[in-house]
Amino acid sequence: MIGKLKGVVDSYGEDFVILDVHGVGYEVHCSARTLQRLPPAGEATDLAIETVVREDMIRLYGFRSDAEREWFRLLQTVQGVGTRVALGLLSVLEPAELATAIATGDKGAVARAPGVGPRLAARLVAELKDKAPAFAPVDPALVRLAGAVEARTAPQPVADAISALVNLGYPQAQASAAVAAALQSAGAEAEAKTLIRLGLRELAR
């Protein structure tokens, strides 16, 4: 199996790059994020590779990091997630963002990926929630805060601040992370307006 390719970018397709390795052109399918970060044609690059072998084809998938490749593999352990959906998820969320979204139960962020509806998003969160921290570090305080919000046991100012940030268009996981950071600086007795202000400052960094 091919585990890594290093060569010169020959050309790009809609969802793949042709990588010239010593005169052999390899068609490597990538997430939109990975394709955006690759250099223009004629420049050298390298990709971690996942080789998928099926009865009628052999297809290569490329990643900028081993973490992205590990998530590609992990996502496909969930029923209903194939290579296309896995790449779609990695196109809208970085590995660390994906880990945080799943660990905090942010089904809305997961459902932003093409081909992921509410039911599949819920299944991804349910099946991978305990595995996510092993693939990317997730702040335990953030997980506890998300759990408290979901269980409606979080202090009202915290819940109000997170709700306000979500209403402004921020994903649930980002809003929770920002409010968690705001709590650390403002203290547990902070009012919602203070948490919102500090949370927005955190999100603007």
Curated annotation (Swiss-Prot):
Residues 153-205 are annotated as: Domain III. Residues 65-143 are annotated as: Domain II. GO terms for biological process: DNA recombination; DNA repair. One of its GO terms (cellular component) is Holliday junction resolvase complex. The RuvA-RuvB-RuvC complex processes Holliday junction (HJ) DNA during genetic recombination and DNA repair, while the RuvA-RuvB complex plays an important role in the rescue of blocked DNA replication forks via replication fork reversal (RFR). RuvA specifically binds to HJ cruciform DNA, conferring on it an open structure. The RuvB hexamer acts as an ATP-dependent pump, pulling dsDNA into and through the RuvAB complex. HJ branch migration allows RuvC to scan DNA until it finds its consensus sequence, where it cleaves and resolves the cruciform DNA. Homotetramer. Forms an RuvA(8)-RuvB(12)-Holliday junction (HJ) complex. HJ DNA is sandwiched between 2 RuvA tetramers; dsDNA enters through RuvA and exits via RuvB. An RuvB hexamer assembles on each DNA strand where it exits the tetramer. Each RuvB hexamer is contacted by two RuvA subunits (via domain III) on 2 adjacent RuvB subunits; this complex drives branch migration. In the full resolvosome a probable DNA-RuvA(4)-RuvB(12)-RuvC(2) complex forms which resolves the HJ. Belongs to the RuvA family. This is Holliday junction branch migration complex subunit RuvA. The gene is ruvA.
